[in-house]
Amino acid sequence: VAYKLNEEKKNTTDEEQTNVVKEDDIGKEIKLGIAEFDTMNPLLSKNKQVQEITKIIYEPLFQLTSDYKLEKCLAKDWAKTAENKYLIKIDTSIKWSDGNNLSVDDVIFTIENLSKIDSIYLENIRHITEINRVDDNTIRLILDQEVPFFEYNLIFPILSKKNYEGQDFIYGSSNNAP
């Protein structure tokens, strides 16, 4: 998390003001007004408010633009190599809020755990039968059949594997905070 959202600034003049975040404040805290939350894990949450809020915390491999075009987010590049095979390069220069770099292990971890839980994103990965690490920044997805525009399914949030190490994915303490 790279924003401090709890400061409210009042505009006492007619001039437009910008909210400047000081470097010392980055990553300190977020205060959210939610009636009730079930979990802060975006893959597990059934709460629409939590799902919307976690969109500013977690990012997907791809995202949709306002005109519904696919745009790279955590993915650096991708290619459909056969009717049912995709290669995806991850942008490993992206850092998590703890300073660790995004890795293919995070993507594999997310997809593997997503396949084991009841999630709003389960349908997105239903056709993935294999996920292989090609190298430090590339994964191969193999599907059980050709799925037209499959890359549009890769819009679910990616989680940090290191953040969940040694914990139960569903009940671990990492689900209590972003």
Regions of interest found by a model, annotated:
Residues 33-81, 112, 176-178:
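N-terminal lobe/hinge region of extracytoplasmic solute-binding protein
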Residues 77-118, 134, 140:
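Aromatic- and charge-enriched surface segment that lines or borders ligand/interaction sites
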Residues 98-101, 149-154:
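Solvent-exposed, non-transmembrane alpha-helical starts
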Residues 154-178:
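Gly/Pro-rich hinge or "lid" segments in bacterial periplasmic/extracellular proteins
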